[in-house]
Amino acid sequence: MLCANNVSAQIGQKKLLKHINFYVKPNELVVIIGPNGAGKSSLLKALCGDIKINNGDITLNDRLLSDYSIASLATLRAVLTQNYELDFPFSVAEVVDMAHFAHQADYSKQQLMHFSEQVMQALSVTHLKTHTFTQLSGGEKQRVQLARVLCQIQPSLVANKTPYLLIDEPTSSLDIFHQYDVMAQAKSIASQGAGVVAVIHDLSLAASFADRIYMLNNGEVAACGIPKEVLTPALLKRVYNINARLENNTSEAMPHIQMCY
């Protein structure tokens, strides 16, 4: 389990997180939502160990995150940030293969290449493998980088270990088809034994795919629970200042947020 225990963080006088308690278990997709500036990306960075926390601790499998070496962490969790650009002209295949570093001591090159082929096919980027990454569209870059982090945790899944995948706004540059496809991939990875944390803005996507939702506001947890417990008219009004409700018609494949005018 990956946990934040009473975590607070600030930069200068700006408080980013205030006494956050959070957890994600194996076989679970947890979605973090909230308005701009709510602390979503800051919480994800804290869970990754990328920002200094002023209070509390982050634990992975009941061990302090700070006690892990960089190499061992790379085998246990993969992170996709909002900044997925690269300055060098790597091919798509080379970008995905960067994930092999974490596992090259335990797997043959042929096995690792098989993992790369699997995730590229799953994310529909195989046809781009010889293309230069810097020449791709924003959505294509995002899918390639997601393929890289999925490739990083794939060996741990095969070995029946429990990896964690943390992804920050993985659907921000994607069309509607690929938004649902990416979230379906995240859900699939969770069903295979991983713990997945995703920061997303689309509340309908959150309702459709999340096992649990954390709603943040002003650096605090405003609510947490299953989608129907969190996406209530009262909370949507208080946190987002919108009049809306969660529609979950059994005749429809996916629940969605209905605005009330």
Curated annotation (Swiss-Prot):
<protein>
    <recommendedName>
        <fullName>Hemin import ATP-binding protein HmuV</fullName>
        <ecNumber>7.6.2.-</ecNumber>
    </recommendedName>
</protein>
<dbReference type="InterPro" id="IPR003439">
    <property type="entry name" value="ABC_transporter-like_ATP-bd"/>
</dbReference>
<feature type="domain" description="ABC transporter">
    <location>
        <begin position="2"/>
        <end position="243"/>
    </location>
</feature>
<keyword id="KW-0472">Membrane</keyword>
<keyword id="KW-0813">Transport</keyword>
<dbReference type="InterPro" id="IPR027417">
    <property type="entry name" value="P-loop_NTPase"/>
</dbReference>
<dbReference type="Pfam" id="PF00005">
    <property type="entry name" value="ABC_tran"/>
</dbReference>
<keyword id="KW-1003">Cell membrane</keyword>
<dbReference type="InterPro" id="IPR003593">
    <property type="entry name" value="AAA+_ATPase"/>
</dbReference>
<dbReference type="GO" id="GO:0016887">
    <property type="term" value="F:ATP hydrolysis activity"/>
</dbReference>
<dbReference type="InterPro" id="IPR017871">
    <property type="entry name" value="ABC_transporter-like_CS"/>
</dbReference>
<comment type="subunit">
    <text>The complex is composed of two ATP-binding proteins (HmuV), two transmembrane proteins (HmuU) and a solute-binding protein (HmuT).</text>
</comment>
<dbReference type="GO" id="GO:0005886">
    <property type="term" value="C:plasma membrane"/>
</dbReference>
<comment type="similarity">
    <text>Belongs to the ABC transporter superfamily. Heme (hemin) importer (TC 3.A.1.14.5) family.</text>
</comment>
<comment type="function">
    <text>Part of the ABC transporter complex HmuTUV involved in hemin import. Responsible for energy coupling to the transport system.</text>
</comment>
<keyword id="KW-1278">Translocase</keyword>
<dbReference type="GO" id="GO:0005524">
    <property type="term" value="F:ATP binding"/>
</dbReference>
<keyword id="KW-0067">ATP-binding</keyword>
<feature type="binding site">
    <location>
        <begin position="34"/>
        <end position="41"/>
    </location>
    <ligand>
        <name>ATP</name>
    </ligand>
</feature>
<keyword id="KW-0547">Nucleotide-binding</keyword>
<keyword id="KW-0997">Cell inner membrane</keyword>
